[in-house]
Amino acid sequence: MSGLLHTTLSGLNSDSYCEISRYRDQHFRGSKKLQEKFLKISSTLYVGNLSFYTTEEQIQELFSKCGDVKRIVMGLDKIKKTPCGFCFVEYYTRADAEHAMRFINGTRLDDRIVRTDWDAGFKEGRQYGRGKTGGQVRDEYRTDYDVGRGGFGKIIQMQKANQQPAVY
């Protein structure tokens, strides 16, 4: 096996992809030690940086490649009850969740880089996002037209291109 390929595969199989992050749920009832214990045995993942248009079916299709998904809970805007850029994916086993952490974290879905992290387990009410609108805080300040992000986006640009008369 070539050196670069071996290094890449060794990295994917290392436990570093499955380590728990420093983030802790502020609403967790219990000590930090107890929360860390739950994170180490959890089969639930927090999935962030999703497009507001990503569907539960897309999440199911992607994450089921790593194992049997028990349930998916889409993050919702508190007021509008519309998707707001995150979800929870619960597997039947920790091993399947570890596969997802290794192979899905950092992949692209709907032109966004998906971020996964361990979660101590979904509890009712956590599907509602944080921030003033209930979405992911970083998305609250975005506008429909954002020069730094390519203007109106690929979909609008394609629609405009299709409306242009053909020149012969």
Curated annotation (Swiss-Prot):
MRNA binds at residues 23, 46, 115-119, 126-130, 136-137. It holds the Pfam family RRM_1. GO terms for biological process: mRNA cis splicing, via spliceosome; mRNA splicing, via spliceosome; mRNA transport; nuclear-transcribed mRNA catabolic process, nonsense-mediated decay; regulation of translation; regulatory ncRNA-mediated gene silencing. Its main location: nucleus. Component of the cap-binding complex (CBC), which binds co-transcriptionally to the 5' cap of pre-mRNAs and is involved in various processes such as pre-mRNA splicing, translation regulation, nonsense-mediated mRNA decay, RNA-mediated gene silencing (RNAi) by microRNAs (miRNAs) and mRNA export. The CBC complex is involved in mRNA export from the nucleus, leading to the recruitment of the mRNA export machinery to the 5' end of mRNA and to mRNA export in a 5' to 3' direction through the nuclear pore. Component of the nuclear cap-binding complex (CBC), a heterodimer composed of NCBP1/CBP80 and NCBP2/CBP20 that interacts with m7GpppG-capped RNA. This is Nuclear cap-binding protein subunit 2. It comes from Gallus gallus. The gene is NCBP2.
